[in-house]
């Protein structure tokens, strides 16, 4: 930004260009120039530059946050672009660098730092240092607990959101004596019950709404809207409900909380030395459940695909409708797991099972074997088939 003819003075606390850039929001009585000056002096850390981080970063940058740090070790994929519009034209570019590039073009009045690393127990405290607020734009329980614990011990509030399919939720943690994430969720959900956008799907506008809401709540926090009175809440959004928005009160800070309680059991030393094992705490479903004798590679299956056999596709129906093998039979794993017998005549034919990535298909083979039906899992599922056998097969 060329400020040679627009330097700040005692009369003008901002550069002339900033008055023109932020004028419309400074006209809002609840915000004003005092709010703009507040934002101008603040530093925000955004963890995750994906579906939530993409809109949040765009609107925070536009609003004039003084500095934004973006940490994400992932790269942009084509499947991201329907909802992560900040990355347009940047497939295969690190997300944090792509987002920082967008910020630099959108608002040269602020500064931005991209970090192409994964947030971990060994670096979280150094990453958080010097920031006024953290936006949790991640999609996994383990990293959410890490963000929470680091924020509590660093004295930094967190604006956290999530989105899946057509629904989203948002809350503020560790602010003004309110609860932290562990207060509300002391025990993580079962690992097998956790879905990501890649598993369950996501509507772009839904995650966009949640990311923009994070940006708005961040602005309110940083400009003192909640400073006098703050009632902890959980904001819920459901795109196909009417009305789509509702807000509910949540429990207060828990005195017995492991992170922010009266006698906390989590410390910086325990985190940095790996004694708080977030992966173990949250669990992780095993990726290999079956012995090799019960599995077959996509290449091996390609040699028998034209022979007589039964192919069960255990994906959910919407995924099956997107693409499938000819003559495959769809029995979703969510249904098969409860069956006491198979609704398909096997008649001695070999049975093979496929899913999207080769996880549910292993569970299905294990179930079929318990029902007395010999079967084999196709390793890596349809994704591996498209990658290793048929490049024309659509992946999603």
UniProtKB/Swiss-Prot annotation:
One of its GO terms (cellular component) is cytoplasm. Binds 1 zinc ion per subunit. Its EC number is 2.7.7.-, 2.8.1.-. It is found in: Cytoplasm, Cytosol. Pfam families: Rhodanese, ThiF. Pathway: tRNA modification; 5-methoxycarbonylmethyl-2-thiouridine-tRNA biosynthesis. InterPro entries: MOCS3/Uba4, Rhodanese-like_dom, Rhodanese-like_dom_sf, ThiF/MoeB/HesA, ThiF_NAD_FAD-bd, Ubiquitin-activating_enz. Zn(2+) binds at residues 180, 183, 257, 260. One of its GO terms (biological process) is cellular response to oxidative stress. It is an enzyme of class 2 (transferase). ATP binds at residues 51, 72, 79-83, 95, 139-140. Its cofactor is Zn(2+). Plays a central role in 2-thiolation of mcm(5)S(2)U at tRNA wobble positions of cytosolic tRNA(Lys), tRNA(Glu) and tRNA(Gln). Acts by mediating the C-terminal thiocarboxylation of sulfur carrier URM1. Its N-terminus first activates URM1 as acyl-adenylate (-COAMP), then the persulfide sulfur on the catalytic cysteine is transferred to URM1 to form thiocarboxylation (-COSH) of its C-terminus. The reaction probably involves hydrogen sulfide that is generated from the persulfide intermediate and that acts as a nucleophile towards URM1. Subsequently, a transient disulfide bond is formed. HAMAP family: MOCS3_Uba4. This is Adenylyltransferase and sulfurtransferase UBA4.
């Amino acid at each position: 930004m060329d400020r040679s003819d627009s330097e700040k003075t005692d009369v003008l606390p901002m550069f002339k260009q900033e008055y023109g850039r932020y004028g419309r929001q400074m006209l809002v009585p609840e915000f004003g120039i005092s709010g703009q000056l507040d934002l101008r002096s603040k530093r925000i850390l955004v963890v995750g530059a994906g579906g939530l981080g993409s809109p949040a970063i765009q609107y925070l940058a536009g609003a004039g946050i003084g500095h934004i740090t973006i940490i994400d070790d992932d790269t942009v994929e084509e499947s991201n672009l329907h909802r992560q519009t900040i990355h347009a034209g940047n497939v295969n570019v690190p997300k944090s660098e792509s987002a920082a590039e967008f910020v630099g073009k959108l608002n040269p009045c602020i500064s931005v730092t991209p970090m192409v690393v994964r947030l971990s127990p060994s670096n979280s405290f150094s990453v958080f240092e010097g920031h006024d607020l953290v936006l949790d734009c991640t999609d996994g329980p383990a990293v959410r607990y890490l963000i929470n614990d680091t924020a509590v011990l660093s004295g930094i509030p967190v604006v956290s959101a999530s989105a899946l399919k057509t629904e989203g939720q948002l809350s503020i943690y560790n602010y003004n004596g309110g609860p932290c994430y562990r207060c509300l969720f002391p025990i993580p959900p079962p690992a097998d019950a956790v879905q990501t956008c890649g598993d369950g799907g996501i509507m772009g506008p839904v995650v966009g709404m949640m990311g923009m809401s994070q940006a708005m709540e961040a602005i309110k926090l940083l400009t003192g809207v909640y400073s006098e009175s703050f009632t902890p809440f959980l904001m819920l959004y459901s795109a196909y409900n009417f009305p789509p928005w509702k807000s509910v009160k949540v429990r207060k800070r828990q005195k017995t909380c492991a992170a922010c309680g009266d006698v906390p059991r989590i410390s910086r030393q325990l985190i940095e030395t790996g004694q708080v094992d977030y992966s173990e705490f949250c669990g992780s479903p095993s990726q290999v459940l079956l012995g090799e004798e019960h599995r077959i590679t996509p290449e091996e299956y390609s040699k028998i695909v034209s022979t007589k056999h039964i192919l069960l596709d255990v994906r959910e129906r919407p995924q099956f409708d997107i693409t499938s093998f000819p003559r495959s039979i769809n029995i979703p794993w969510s249904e098969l797991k409860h069956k006491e017998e198979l609704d398909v005549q096997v008649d001695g034919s070999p049975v093979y099972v496929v899913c999207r990535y080769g996880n549910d298909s292993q569970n299905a083979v294990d179930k079929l074997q318990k029902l007395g039906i010999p079967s084999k899992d196709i390793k890596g599922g349809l994704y591996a088939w498209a990658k290793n056998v048929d490049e024309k097969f659509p992946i999603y």
